[in-house]
Amino acid sequence: MTTRIDTRFAELKKQGRSAFVTFLMGGDPDPATSLAIIKALPKAGADIIEIGMPFTDPMADGPAVQAAGRRALNAGMTVTRTLQMIHDFRKGEGSTPVVLMGYYNPIYIYGVEKFLTDAKAAGVDGLIVVDLPPEEDSELCIPAMKAGLNFIRLATPTTDDKRLPAVLANTSGFVYYVSITGITGSAAADSTAVGAAVARIKRHTTLPVCVGFGIRTADAARGIAERSDGAVVGSALVDALSGSLDAEGKATAKTVNAVADLAAALAAGVRSARQAAE
């Protein structure tokens, strides 16, 4: 099974560069604006798009992403509407991989089998479910693989060599290395430490390793991209979105461009990385 994610990383390897991976909350600040932003991301340079599924108890998310989830939920975003948004995105974009990121509870309530069928039909390529450990692979990870979806696992600075094989056992698509301990958006990533961590993970897997948490600028994105297979940026894009909203938290004429312009600057940082390393 070759997925869009596999194809994208193969293309990037030929180009000699790392991936620029964006994260935004689905439905933030409202479903229509969210779709317009996501449609603008490939042109801005996003190689892979992660879309958050809003949830009422997002334990791994920092304040910015939690606020994004609240805005999305208040605007009526649901799992069904998130999948519909991806379906609408796919009408005009067939090659950029889309990864859904979230928590198990909304998927469980929706129904695992139905969710996987509907996600695949909508054009989803992979899942990141932050609160399902490898010991629970039979719940969602293995069914997702059977449905043709990549299941992307998180590794952290505290994931030691003893634990890594279990974390990586059924992982596919790529490994998402969380470069700092704590919640999203809480600190800056240390690119030197990241390089050592990526090398350690690669001793256990042939999968690409993307690095997220703490990347806010083009320079930081370049530093991470030089030491990994991809730089994931979320909180900085969410902050750009929230900074463009009006006093009521509603979208303005600036909202789509605020996110797309920052994405383009970050993408340029990532794309300059391999040239600098050569």
From Swiss-Prot:
Pfam families: Trp_syntA. It is an enzyme of class 4 (lyase). Pathway: Amino-acid biosynthesis; L-tryptophan biosynthesis; L-tryptophan from chorismate: step 5/5. One of its GO terms (molecular function) is tryptophan synthase activity. Keywords: Amino-acid biosynthesis, Aromatic amino acid biosynthesis, Lyase, Tryptophan biosynthesis. It comes from the Bacteria. One of its GO terms (cellular component) is cytosol. The active site is at E50, D61. Belongs to the TrpA family. HAMAP family: Trp_synth_alpha. Tetramer of two alpha and two beta chains. The alpha subunit is responsible for the aldol cleavage of indoleglycerol phosphate to indole and glyceraldehyde 3-phosphate. This is Tryptophan synthase alpha chain. It comes from Nitrobacter hamburgensis (strain DSM 10229 / NCIMB 13809 / X14). The gene is trpA.
